[in-house]
């Protein structure tokens, strides 16, 4: 088991900065030297660690050292088999898991109030949505989560579906019974995908709703920046040991 006290990327960046390396590559601000206005705004400490992928800092496209170790630490913290760092928001994590499980013409069962990133994934990959109406709380005027009965009905009517997609929670904080839905999906040979853009804290608090990985989800897209305290756009794609990693390829480098 890896130490949860470690921060491999942070440690590597501090060491890199201490070496006072003169960069001859991107980014163009050259650790702040080339853009004094931005350096004044963000601070020199920030600018000197905004650097490109290099051997000491690893590469997100094919991590072999500090990024790989950091992802392993994250996976253990979230109770997942694997964790992949995402640098362009949970939108990319949602799209990655949807594209991984369903090819063109194949079905994914999902609530009608999914995030538009899930809809865009269907458009990109050509998968077919089977919508489940989540219902509406008339007093509050907000959409709810999917009921187990409605999901079961959708599964029985679409036994060829490849996955069930669950918001855990919805934008308004409503949770479906993700454990029962995961069990239903698996009983019919389907993956369970959890959009946990607003559920990062479920993994680290007492008396919280059940987190996706603990409920048996095969994939979970987790927004670290929304309730995890990290910078905007940072996210994780978590996978369980039920997932063949050849289904997934995250190709977002730290710097284009």
Q: What are the residue ranges of the model-derived segments?
A:
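N-terminal "arm"/small-domain region of PLP-dependent enzymes with the aminotransferase-like
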Residues: 1-65
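Conserved N-terminal alpha-helix of the aminotransferase class I/II PLP-enzyme fold
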Residues: 46-92
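Conserved beta-loop-alpha segment that forms the PLP phosphate-binding cup at the N-terminus of a helix
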Residues: 82-107, 120-121
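PLP-dependent aminotransferase-like
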Residues: 106-166
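Active-site phosphate-binding strand-loop segment of PLP-dependent enzymes
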Residues: 140-200
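Conserved active-site segment immediately N-terminal to the catalytic lysine
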Residues: 206-225
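Short beta-strand-to-turn element immediately C-terminal to the catalytic PLP-Schiff-base lysine
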Residues: 214, 236-241
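Residue-level detector of conserved catalytic or cofactor/ligand-binding positions
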Residues: 245-256
